[in-house]
Amino acid sequence: MKKTIMTRFGEVEFDPENTVLFVDGLIGFENLRDFIVMPNRKNGPLFWIQSVEEPDLAFVLTDPTNFFLDYKVVPDARERAKLGIGTDDDCHALAVVTVPPDRKVTLNLMAPVLFAPATNRAIQVVLEKSQYKTRHPLPA
């Protein structure tokens, strides 16, 4: 049965069976766990995740390999357990996008979102000893 929420994008209808469960929430938003994926109205590599519990909250995400071909995150056993997947299951690393007033877009490559399509679960992890930053600028 479809549900409807009022968001910054207007009224959005969604199927609760298709929500993405953020097992531990997102950093700073640990109490929010259910999100829906919303495509960007403009064609391109960016998309939105919209909180179901807090309709005013949405984040822009992207596949960082669109900009950094060598970016790779391999989930460890603990992370795979949280995602409910085995070693052979797909897991996508996504980056939270920041678009400040000066329009100098950055990606949070130090704390990627790991998404498991098989279970519709996601977690945000912090990479230790990373060469990347929380506000990593896009390549010129």
Swiss-Prot record:
It is found in: Cytoplasm. SUPFAM superfamilies: BH3618-like. The keyword GTP-binding does not apply. One of its GO terms (cellular component) is cytoplasm. InterPro entries: Flagellar_assembly_factor_FliW (IPR003775), Flagellar_assmbl_FliW_dom_sf (IPR024046). The keyword Nuclease does not apply. This is Flagellar assembly factor FliW. It comes from the Bacteria. GO terms for biological process: bacterial-type flagellum assembly; regulation of translation. Keywords: Bacterial flagellum biogenesis, Chaperone, Cytoplasm, Translation regulation. The gene is fliW. Belongs to the FliW family.
